[in-house]
Design a protein with these regions (language model features):
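Cleavable N-terminal export/targeting peptides
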Residues: 1-50, 387
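Transmembrane beta-strands of outer-membrane beta-barrel pores
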Residues: 58-62, 91-95, 123-125, 134-138, ...
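Short loop/turn motifs that connect adjacent beta-strands in outer-membrane beta-barrel proteins
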Residues: 45-51, 82, 154-158, 198, ...
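Transmembrane beta-strands of outer-membrane beta-barrel proteins
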Residues: 52-56, 85-87, 128-130, 158-162, ...
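Residues that define the transmembrane beta-barrel architecture of outer-membrane proteins
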Residues: 67-71, 111-115, 122, 141-145, ...
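Outer membrane beta-barrel transmembrane domains
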Residues: 100, 104-105, 208, 214-246, ...
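Short glycine/proline- and aromatic-enriched beta-strand/turn motifs that initiate or cap beta-hairpins
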Residues: 44-86, 356, 377-378
């Protein structure tokens, strides 16, 4: 279990990004000059299968006393005119000396591996995607299955998508072995609309239901200055709404794109979070594609969070992920198109760096008694080959 808000949140985002790269929003991109950093032209009439491709990536995270790195692989191949299969492999090697660990326990190292298999089937203007994922680490085992369906309507100008995921986890600790379970349901609905030949917009709503053991066996809370084991509710219901706009703002060889995203998250633990991200993408010549982006996130604390509780309650947590905090991220990405290799493989080299700064408003470092904050550095290097 990774115990820092920055690293755990980032690694979940990274795994999701790898799973959907590079077909993300490609269908809508056929009607734009630039969409989210992928530039294409043409008309939108029917859904195409994702390209045959292979991706290899190295990821690195360093922040808040936690260091995580490892490789990731993704392979996708068409096996029929309408069917494509994919598989991915992901490793996190974590060295954890975060504030949660060094103040209540000893630093530790662990490795997490994840495997996934998926299939995409297209028929006319519809696509069905089925995938399964299994993740294993010394004290946590997770399995999930997802089903997503998308349908283009109104001549390809609108795409409607529906999806559902089911997860089943085994929760443990280094001291007790596996001692409990957790279950997760996720339901998704989205609409992507081409507004003009240069602009599109999407809206996505997700509902999440969790039950079982939802805490962390290594984390403790403070009650009257005394350390006690955290106590979490065994159920949680969450909602997330995301709005995204992407547009082509370039002309001729000065092709460029601008994107803006807003996400609102709320749950029955009374957490509320707002996230805003803006990005700019531009070609530099025929071979180089650059992107710069900035992201801001702010969160309000959970009902049962307390830095140092002054009364006994049924639930209590000092998990900084549930506190009041904000984070700012700024990053850049560069893509180099190397062209054809062996007259078959179209190769692209990619590098992305992001700097993040976390500031906590009501979580203190018990070593210094000051409000806690930390900075994080994130690096991704990957190569993609279509064939």
């Amino acid at each position: 279990m990774v115990a820092t808000s920055g690293s755990s949140i980032w690694m979940r985002r990274l795994r999701r990004a790898l799973a959907r790269r590079p077909h993300h929003l490609m269908r809508a991109g056929r009607a734009l000059g630039v969409v989210g950093g992928v530039m294409a032209a043409g008309g939108a009439y029917a859904i195409d299968l994702p390209e045959d491709r292979a991706d290899a990536m190295y990821h690195f995270y360093d922040g808040g006393g936690t260091r995580a790195d490892g490789p990731a692989l993704l392979i996708r191949k068409k096996v029929a005119d309408r069917l494509s299969i994919s598989g991915s492999y992901f490793i996190d090697s974590v060295s954890n000396a975060s504030i949660d660990v060094v103040t209540t326990a000893s630093p530790y190292k662990e490795k997490r591996t994840e495997y996934s298999l998926g299939a995409d089937y297209v028929y006319r203007d519809a696509q069905v995607s089925l995938s399964g994922t299994t993740s294993d680490e010394p004290d946590y085992k997770a399995n999930s299955v997802s089903l997503d369906v998308s349908q283009e309507v109104f001549g390809g100008m609108t795409t409607i998508s529906l999806g559902a995921s089911r997860g089943a986890d085994h929760v443990g600790s280094r001291y007790e072995g596996m001692f409990d379970r957790a279950q997760h349901w996720r339901y998704r609905f989205g609409v992507t609309q081409i507004l003009t030949p240069r602009w599109l917009m999407s809206a996505n709503l997700e509902a999440i239901s969790d039950n079982g053991y939802l805490g962390n066996p290594y984390r403790v809370a403070q009650v009257f200055g005394t350390l006690v084991q955290e106590r979490y509710p065994r159920t949680r219901s969450s909602r997330a709404l995301k709005l995204r706009a992407v547009g082509d703002i370039g002309q001729g060889e000065q092709r460029a794109a601008l994107r803006a995203e807003y996400r609102y998250f709320w749950d029955n633990w009374e957490i509320k979070a707002h996230t805003l991200e803006v990005g700019y993408t531009r070609y530099f010549g025929a071979e180089w594609l650059g992107e710069a982006f900035v992201r801001y996130n702010t969160q309000k604390q959970a009902l049962f969070y307390s830095d140092n509780a002054q009364s006994e309650t049924l639930y209590v947590s000092r998990n900084k992920q549930l506190s009041d905090f904000n984070d700012v991220g700024i990053g850049a990405k560069a893509t180099y198109s190397a062209g054809k290799i062996a007259d078959k493989f179209d190769v692209k080299w990619n590098a992305q760096y992001q700097f993040m700064r976390f500031r906590y408003k009501n979580f203190t470092d018990i070593r210094t008694h000051g409000l806690y904050s930390f900075d994080a550095n994130i690096l991704e290097l990957f190569v993609s080959a279509t064939f």
